[in-house]
Amino acid sequence: MSSVVETVTNLVTPILDENHFELVDVEFVKEGKSWYLRVYIDKPNGINIEECALVSDKLSEKLDSCDPDPIPQAYYLEVSSPGAERPLKKEKDYERALNKYIHISLYQAIDGQKVYEGTMVDLNKETLTLEYRVKTRTVTKTFDRNKIAKARLAIKF
């Protein structure tokens, strides 16, 4: 599957560069009996449906013209924004999320917990620091970034 992701990344990058869009993520996943190629794009002020359709059309043309076909099985192509709970994958994503409410999942539990949500109050190459509430107390905890399995923006309720 990684070769599909790499191929699609290489095909879509010039389209995005030409339109000043950013590639957030590419996924090629099987759900039930169907395969989905998902391309998440964004730009500083947010992406709209027409821009997603433009990228979808251009990427579809490029994929159809490849020989041999990089994706031999049938699949659904979806191009969309990363949504309100966008994943944090690149360094730039983490920098933009500073002072925002985020969700992190750890590879291994710390203090019996693998999932944390809070405001990221500090960030450097090795660690990030979250501030969150435990009942009536505000807690600040620093996490090694190499111990974080996934991170994303979160909506605070």
Swiss-Prot record:
Source species, domain of life: Bacteria
A family per Pfam: RimP_N
Compartments reported by the entry: Cytoplasm
Keyword Cytoplasm: yes
GO cellular component: cytosol
HAMAP family: RimP
Name listed for the protein in its UniProt record: Ribosome maturation factor RimP
